[in-house]
Amino acid sequence: MTQKIIRVGNIEIANDKPFVLFGGMNVLESRDLAMKVCEEYVRVTEKLGIPYVFKASFDKANRSSVTSYRGPGMEEGLKIFEEIKRTFNVPVITDVHEPYQAEPVAKVCDIIQLPAFLSRQTDLVVAMAKTGVVINIKKAQFLAPQEMKHILAKCEEAGNDQLILCERGSSFGYNNLVVDMLGFGIMKQFEYPVFFDVTHALQMPGGRADSAGGRRAQVTDLAKAGMSQGLAGLFLEAHPDPDNAKCDGPCALRLDKLEPFLVQLKQLDDLVKSFPTVETA
């Protein structure tokens, strides 16, 4: 089965190539913190030889509570992304929530992300696709992996085949998510690169009444399980002080654990991709 290669600058993204890291923090809390977090990701990924794209959100539009922190907004957020790109010479990925945001965000960011909750919103999908920029499509918690073909088709119909699929878990009753490992193989059949968002797969949506809970202690186990499927990349959020993060701290990896965590993931990815394909159909 031929696997599509998506190129972002000098980075090649495909299911049969060494994994790429989309990593950073959940939401931009401040310019200084974003710079600190990116600096550590760059240090570790350069040391380990892992292709890297910085990730953060300028707005968290789907917070549980009306009083929850959402971010600095698009205008200020894009200024921070521009500085990060200049300072660290890394690509940037961020999410958009409304059609009007697609074009200005695409002028700054190398990859734009379609949020899971919004992945069936046709007007948003088409607006993003028409930018021509690479799109990371999050699989909604309520969609089966085979249903992702419809979102791919919307993008392709709008003229964009620079697409990535991203698994982030499926709803399992109330306040819980599970990851169906068989879903990775189903999505890989579409031939586009498939990523695993281990951070949000650890969420317990609404688990703390006014915000999401999480299972940070299990991040290594779940990441290894997902990456054992031979994926194009990993989506990861880290924070220097997760317990005081302004969003999704319970799911975030401690920043000082980033290097030992990625050492193991790279070794696993190298091993899995060294195996020949065994046809069992």
UniProtKB/Swiss-Prot annotation:
Q: Which GO terms describe its molecular function?
A: 3-deoxy-8-phosphooctulonate synthase activity
Give the principal location in a single coarse category: cytoplasm
- What processes does the entry annotate via GO biological process terms? keto-3-deoxy-D-manno-octulosonic acid biosynthetic process
**Which SUPFAM superfamilies does this UniProt record tie to the protein?**
Aldolase (SSF51569)
- Catalyzes what? D-arabinose 5-phosphate + phosphoenolpyruvate + H2O = 3-deoxy-alpha-D-manno-2-octulosonate-8-phosphate + phosphate
Tell me which InterPro entries the record gives.
Aldolase_TIM (IPR013785), DAHP1/KDSA (IPR006218), KDO8P_synthase (IPR006269)
Q: Name one GO cellular component term.
A: cytoplasm
**According to the lineage, what is the superkingdom?**
Bacteria
Annotated keywords: Cytoplasm, Lipopolysaccharide biosynthesis, Transferase
Q: In which pathway does it act?
A: Carbohydrate biosynthesis; 3-deoxy-D-manno-octulosonate biosynthesis; 3-deoxy-D-manno-octulosonate from D-ribulose 5-phosphate: step 2/3; Bacterial outer membrane biogenesis; lipopolysaccharide biosynthesis
Q: Where is this protein localized, as stated in its record?
A: Cytoplasm
Kindly name one Pfam family recorded for this protein.
DAHP_synth_1
Entry's EC annotation: 2.5.1.55
Q: Which family does it belong to?
A: Belongs to the KdsA family.
Protein name in UniProt: 2-dehydro-3-deoxyphosphooctonate aldolase 1
What does the organism's lineage look like at the top? Answer: Bacteria, Pseudomonadati, Pseudomonadota, Gammaproteobacteria, Pseudomonadales
